[in-house]
């Protein structure tokens, strides 16, 4: 039945909403407060490039990627701005294999790159305030950085605080976990994955006029961190002071954005930066006589066994291992267990790359991206 009006409590079917994702709010009036968006526990941890075998099929590929993204919010599609490649990112190699299979089933021939693990950049301590100057040297900003508290991240995960939530309620929630009142009131933005910028300046002139430019510089930095041009995670940025030129001509985006990013990067590099790698939880079901083989595979893959449970003649082994070590897991596990083990993988958490490996991992990432092998120093972003 087609109706023009439906009261609360009913479930309608809507047609023609081609670009609407699951969890979005649809409204015909403005302004309106959207419903809380759907929060997904997992984040994309593996990415690959995909392109059509024939250039004429590019529009079809773009359309298919858009539809896949709408149907599966955990699958992220993007464009590499430097190479022009279309990238798909998901929760693991199997997730990407399913996506590419769905594409080829439409009759479109594609080629793909080898899957690459996604890393995150983070800090382990507090640093700043660090001063950054605009390219024309007429304006300057002071920034502090620190790891975002676990309690705040939990509030984000639960949806109690969000970018589009009530600011008064957000401030109250932050005060309840120990934030000072001025910090709680000064939150400008909450950005994925779990980052926040806070204004604690007092009586700064022209601040509202440059606010969007500061946010743009901050988000520019979040998108590609200074260590390996990987996305930054779990960062709290505080603006502690700012001095702006009185003439708007001298404080435009070309001045404010790089000023903000440079100060943020200098502080970031002082605050004991590190790389985070995605960790997968592996659950394995295997006959008891093959328990040693399974635990051996997990250990060989830089992993650890979390629990072992006996149920009848079968043993259930739960462990954790880095995503980068799972690419050939099928072959290794089959070889060690003669194909008698059944297992599944799911994203568990982000964990710092071991100190013994971080230099080589950073160099590999920077080499792949065409960067110099040595990461920048704080002084590279300071006057």
Question: PLM features: what roles do these ranges have?
Answer:
Residues 1-383:
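Accessory interaction regions appended to the cores of large information-processing enzymes
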């Amino acid at each position: 039945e087609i109706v023009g009006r439906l009261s609360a409590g009913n479930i309608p079917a809507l047609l023609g909403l081609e670009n609407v994702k699951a969890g979005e709010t649809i409204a015909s009036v403005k302004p309106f407060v959207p419903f809380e968006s759907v929060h997904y526990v997992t984040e994309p941890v593996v990415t690959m490039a995909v392109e059509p075998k024939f250039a004429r099929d590019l529009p079809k590929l773009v359309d298919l990627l858009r539809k896949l993204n709408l149907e599966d919010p955990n699958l992220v599609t993007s464009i590499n701005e430097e190479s022009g490649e279309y990238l798909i990112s998901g929760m693991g190699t199997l997730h990407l294999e399913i996506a590419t299979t769905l594409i080829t089933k439409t009759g479109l021939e594609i080629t793909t790159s080898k899957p690459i693990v996604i890393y995150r950049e983070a800090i382990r301590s507090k640093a700043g305030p660090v001063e950054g100057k605009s390219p024309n040297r007429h304006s300057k900003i002071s920034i502090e950085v620190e790891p975002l508290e676990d309690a705040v991240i939990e509030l984000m995960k639960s949806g109690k605080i969000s970018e589009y939530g009530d600011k008064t309620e957000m401030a109250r929630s932050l005060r309840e976990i120990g934030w000072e009142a001025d910090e709680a009131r000064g939150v400008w933005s909450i950005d994925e994955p779990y980052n926040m910028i806070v204004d604690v300046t007092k009586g700064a002139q022209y601040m509202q006029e440059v606010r969007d430019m500061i946010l743009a510089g901050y988000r520019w930095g979040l998108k590609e961190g200074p260590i390996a041009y990987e996305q930054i995670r779990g960062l709290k940025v505080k603006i502690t002071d700012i001095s702006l030129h009185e003439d708007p001509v001298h404080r435009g985006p070309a001045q404010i954005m790089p000023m903000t990013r440079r100060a943020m990067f200098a502080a970031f590099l002082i605050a004991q930066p590190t790389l985070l790698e995605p960790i997968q939880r592996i659950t394995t079901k295997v006959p008891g006589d093959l328990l040693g083989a399974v635990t051996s595979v997990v250990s060989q893959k830089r992993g650890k066994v979390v629990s072992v449970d006996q149920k009848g003649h079968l043993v259930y082994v739960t462990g954790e291992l880095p995503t980068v070590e799972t690419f050939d897991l099928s072959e290794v596990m089959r070889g060690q267990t003669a194909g008698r083990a059944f297992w599944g993988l799911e994203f568990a958490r982000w964990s710092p790359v071991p100190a013994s490996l971080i230099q080589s991992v950073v160099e590999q990432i920077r080499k792949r991206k065409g960067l110099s092998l040595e990461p920048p120093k704080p002084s590279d972003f300071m006057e």
